[in-house]
């Protein structure tokens, strides 16, 4: 080897020769890698920061640093609607790219398969959210689709109302001059609801007015899940995580405990034969020929609990925070809610549907703060995306946060304006928003892999916010936070303390 021969001529001992050789290799490989990526890679023509086009450093720094949605949005503002964010990855932000990447495979459109980013958790098999094979995913979706249909969810309103009644009662009991941290309380509510709908058994968080230990396990476990993309792109990074994150072993143990507890809950539910009101497991277990193995059921339960809790909780917290920052908009919604209902029993799935301003508040909050703000990566089969020829094997995605903040599609995209979602015949309709391209906002994705729980999310958001405004006046006690720019992101948004004083009206 030339490098070793060169070092031998210097008359150094053998050990130093090999140390020198290793150092040469360590320097030569990244140099070669960077030169290839910049000048010879099939994606070399796409714009982006030098450090992102040549290596994974930009990706790792911003993903681990908690500012991913904001950093990516800044890149699109600088470079345009397609940006190279890693040597093998492109990020898009156009409305058309939503359809090109995630849309249904019709009229010759090729299928964009999920990447290894979605690999199953631990020893669990793939679930409905992580399965990359389109045929296997379709089979899973057929099993669960009926569970999330509007007709079935309408029948689950009693479950939601049971926890809303308990939630309201606990607010009245525990409210004090210092208020209550609604970001924590909304977690209790959404975890209890999804726990009951999945396992026919809640976590008891609302009833006991404290965070169930499993909720802690889930939230903390999500942090290590957020590191998986870095481990995949830079395998050697696993060796350094203990130094970067000193409590990594503790976090990993919590992740294992979470999976074990999920398995225990799933098997307990699977072995029950006294269920009258159908829950999600009723559909998993009731489909003839469906996979009912222990690990499969655990994987589905893991996905259902995570997807149906934290995402809804952060949206509820953000809505309340925005409304309390803008009293004029809060008054409009209060008037709509209290003008529509005279009794809490009227606040149900159908009763909240006609409330147009409530719908607008929800949609605008989801636009400003998509619960899953990062782009869901897909492998390009070799296709044209929004006019760009993208080579086969390229990782591509659209960031919901970036697309919903793009000045090309929105008037004052950084402002929170529920009015932009009102129909033209509404008294508060403002024509300044008529040119907004609402197709750019896809908080639940789109196409055949659109979030299965979208109907449940809207029902919970409508019923919870309407019920709180019917029951209480609210006052923000904590320091106002710009939810649009100040939140950090680690797999999910990291909520900030939002203390609210509630004054009961009934």
Curated annotation (Swiss-Prot):
Pfam families per the UniProt record, alphabetical: p450 (PF00067)
Enzyme class: oxidoreductase
CDD domains xrefs: CYP60B-like (cd11058)
Cofactor or coenzyme needed: heme
Claim: DNA-binding is one of the keywords in the record: no
PANTHER family reported for this sequence: CYTOCHROME P450, CYTOCHROME P450 MONOOXYGENASE ASQL-RELATED
Function text: Cytochrome P450 monooxygenase; part of the gene cluster A that mediates the biosynthesis of botcinic acid and its botcinin derivatives, acetate-derived polyketides that contribute to virulence when combined with the sesquiterpene botrydial. Botcinic acid and its derivatives have been shown to induce chlorosis and necrosis during host plant infection, but also have antifungal activities. Two polyketide synthases, BOA6 and BOA9, are involved in the biosynthesis of botcinins.
Protein family according to the UniProt entry: Belongs to the cytochrome P450 family.
Name under which the protein is recorded: Cytochrome P450 monooxygenase BOA3
Protein species of origin: Botryotinia fuckeliana (strain B05.10) (Noble rot fungus)
């Amino acid at each position: 080897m030339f490098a070793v021969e060169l070092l031998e001529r210097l008359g150094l001992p053998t050990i130093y020769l090999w140390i020198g050789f290793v150092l040469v290799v360590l320097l030569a490989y990244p140099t070669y890698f960077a030169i290839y990526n910049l000048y010879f890679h099939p994606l070399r023509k796409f714009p982006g920061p030098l450090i992102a086009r040549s290596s994974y450093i930009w990706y790792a720094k911003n993903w681990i640093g908690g500012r991913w949605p904001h950093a990516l949005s800044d890149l699109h503002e600088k470079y345009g609607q397609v940006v190279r964010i890693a040597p093998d990855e492109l990020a898009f932000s156009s409305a058309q790219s939503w359809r090109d990447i995630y849309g249904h495979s019709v009229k010759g459109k090729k299928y964009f398969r999920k990447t290894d980013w979605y690999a199953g958790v631990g020893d669990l098999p793939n679930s409905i959210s992580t399965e990359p094979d389109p045929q296997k995913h379709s089979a899973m979706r057929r099993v669960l689709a009926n569970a999330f249909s509007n007709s079935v969810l309408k029948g689950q309103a009693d479950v939601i109302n049971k926890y809303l009644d308990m939630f309201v009662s606990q607010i009245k009991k525990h409210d004090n001059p210092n208020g209550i941290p609604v970001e924590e309380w909304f977690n209790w509510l959404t975890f209890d609801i999804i726990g009951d709908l999945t396992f026919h058994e809640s976590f008891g968080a609302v009833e006991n007015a404290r965070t169930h230990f499993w909720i802690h396990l889930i939230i903390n476990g999500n942090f290590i899940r957020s590191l998986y993309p870095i481990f995949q792109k830079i395998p050697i990074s696993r060796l350094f995580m203990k130094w970067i994150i000193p409590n990594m072993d503790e976090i990993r143990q919590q992740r294992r405990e979470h999976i074990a507890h999920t398995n225990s809950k799933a098997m307990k539910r699977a072995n029950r034969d006294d269920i009258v009101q159908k829950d999600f497991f009723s559909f998993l277990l009731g489909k003839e020929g469906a996979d009912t193995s222990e690990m499969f059921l655990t994987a589905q339960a893991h996905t259902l609990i995570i997807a149906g809790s934290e995402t809804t909780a952060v949206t509820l917290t953000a809505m309340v925070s925005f409304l309390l920052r803008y009293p004029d908009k809060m008054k409009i919604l209060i008037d709509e809610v209290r003008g529509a209902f005279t009794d809490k029993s009227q606040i149900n799935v159908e009763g909240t549907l006609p409330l147009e301003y409530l719908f607008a508040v929800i949609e605008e909050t989801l636009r400003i703060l998509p619960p899953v703000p990062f782009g869901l990566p897909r492998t390009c089969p070799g296709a044209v995306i929004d006019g760009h020829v993208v080579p086969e094997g390229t990782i591509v995605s659209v960031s919901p946060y970036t697309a919903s903040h793009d000045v090309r599609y929105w008037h004052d995209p950084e402002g929170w304006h529920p009015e932009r979602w009102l129909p033209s015949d509404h008294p508060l309709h403002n024509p300044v928003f008529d040119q907004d391209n609402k197709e750019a906002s896809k908080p639940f994705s789109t196409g055949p892999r659109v979030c299965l729980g979208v109907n449940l999310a809207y029902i919970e958001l409508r019923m919870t916010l309407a019920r709180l405004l019917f029951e209480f006046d609210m006052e923000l006690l904590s320091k106002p936070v710009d939810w649009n720019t100040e939140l950090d992101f680690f797999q999910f948004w990291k909520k900030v303390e939002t203390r609210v004083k509630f004054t009961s009206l009934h």
